[in-house]
Amino acid sequence: MKESVSSFLSNVLSVILGIAITFAVQGMIDRSQVRREVRSALKLIRTELQSNQADIATMAEYLDAERDAAKYFLSLDDGWTGASPDSVDLYGGILLADASIALSDDALELLKMSSLFQSIGNDALSMKIIHAYDTCELIAAALNRHIEARNARLGDVEDIRTFFMSAEGRKALRLISLQANPARVADAEDLETAIQAIDKYL
């Protein structure tokens, strides 16, 4: 009787131990899978932030060129006697270019929808990522407002020379030449901070 009870208890303990080991191993596998998914999601975030960074840098260069173009036209005398046709075409093209910017947040939205955000396990990193995307939104809004205001000032210019020699055109040029560059004024360093934090986490 003692042997059968002992054997029964041994079997029960073996089953319990087997179940416990199975759950422990499954838990480790699940955690490892979540860590892999988090790393993959963060790599997408990093790539998207780097792309946004590049777009902001490109727009910053364009707006610097726009200001230089306005200064060029303001430097000409009333008769434009010193203007070269090539320069007029180049700078006029810059000022009248159809520009806009749209910074992406698809990777962030995917991370939020996948419920992996809380699995990052690093509140400081999560906040840096959110702050970087908030900064992207602010920069894009500032840049697009700037471009809309510029377009409103310039209107539908048919003849560059006639417009920029007019009082209205000179006023528009002065405003453009004095405006700060929103892409350089805004704190785009937030994106680099988040990218570096992701690199450290990975």
Label the model's feature ranges.
Residues 13-14, 32, 97-98:
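A generic short-segment signal for beta-strand/edge and adjacent turn/coil regions
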